[in-house]
């Protein structure tokens, strides 16, 4: 779970590998519980029980339950942005970069449904957290995928919407990589975009 989460209010990042391992164990347990029973049906005691960790240990790293949720959101944001950068780095053509960006995200959703569910679930947990998450993605995509285009912000949000819904379609239909590529090309080269 070490995806360069550096500083978040309510989170005390450990300075040792052992401390980081304990914090990640708690975060992993919370992630599983949030994904299966939901944020509101999960208690700190449940998280600690699942992590086989004392409740006091939780409070060394997190002030509240919502702080571990924030930690997970930051982890996902960092992971998605780092991996998106890697996915599009070989492409210079803007259409190819956008295609690869959509492809990356659709594959991310199909391979990491828990992350996707927790990110979208944040709208019910803390609307500001949800807003900040998607604003961060949009701002990042503006520069990476659209450059100086004056409509870059609108296009960035449009791409996020398209990527999310295509990802859900890929999950629902259990699409192969080949089918995902075909679907993305149909969208990119249709009159829609």
What is each of the regions a protein language model found here?
Residues 62, 69-79, 83, 119, ...:
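Alpha-helical DNA-contacting segments of helix-turn-helix folds
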Residues 20-32, 78, 83-85, 130-132:
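A short, Lys/Arg-enriched amphipathic alpha-helix from helix-turn-helix/homeodomain DNA-binding modules
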Residues 116-121, 128, 145-191:
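Hydrophobic/aromatic-rich alpha-helical bundle segments in the mid-to-C-terminal region
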Residues 29, 33, 104, 108, ...:
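Amphipathic alpha-helical interface segments
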Residues 71, 85-111, 181:
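Hydrophobic alpha-helical connector segments
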Residues 25, 29, 33-67, 71:
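Helix-turn-helix
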Residues 1-21:
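N-terminal intrinsically disordered/low-complexity leader segments
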Residues 78-81, 100, 124-157:
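Amphipathic alpha-helical packing segments from all-alpha helical-bundle domains
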């Amino acid at each position: 779970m070490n995806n360069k989460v550096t500083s978040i209010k309510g989170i005390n990042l450990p300075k040792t590998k052992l401390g980081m391992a304990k914090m990640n164990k708690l975060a992993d347990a919370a992630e599983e519980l949030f994904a299966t029973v939901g944020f509101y049906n999960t208690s700190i005691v449940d998280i600690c029980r699942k992590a086989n960790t004392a409740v006091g240990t939780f409070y060394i790293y997190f002030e509240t339950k919502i702080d571990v949720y924030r930690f997970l959101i930051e982890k996902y944001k960092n992971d998605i942005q780092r991996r998106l950068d890697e996915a599009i780095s070989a492409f210079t053509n803007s259409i190819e970069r956008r295609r690869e960006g959509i492809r990356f995200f659709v594959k991310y959703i199909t391979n990491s449904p828990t992350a996707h569910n927790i990110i979208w679930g944040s709208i019910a947990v803390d609307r500001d957290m949800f807003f900040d998450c998607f604003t961060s993605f949009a701002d990042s995509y503006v520069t990476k995928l659209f450059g100086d285009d004056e409509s870059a912000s609108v296009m960035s949000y449009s791409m996020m919407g398209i990527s999310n819904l295509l990802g859900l379609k890929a999950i629902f239909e259990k699409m192969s990589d080949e089918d995902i590529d075909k679907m993305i090309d149909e969208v990119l080269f249709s009159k829609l975009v």
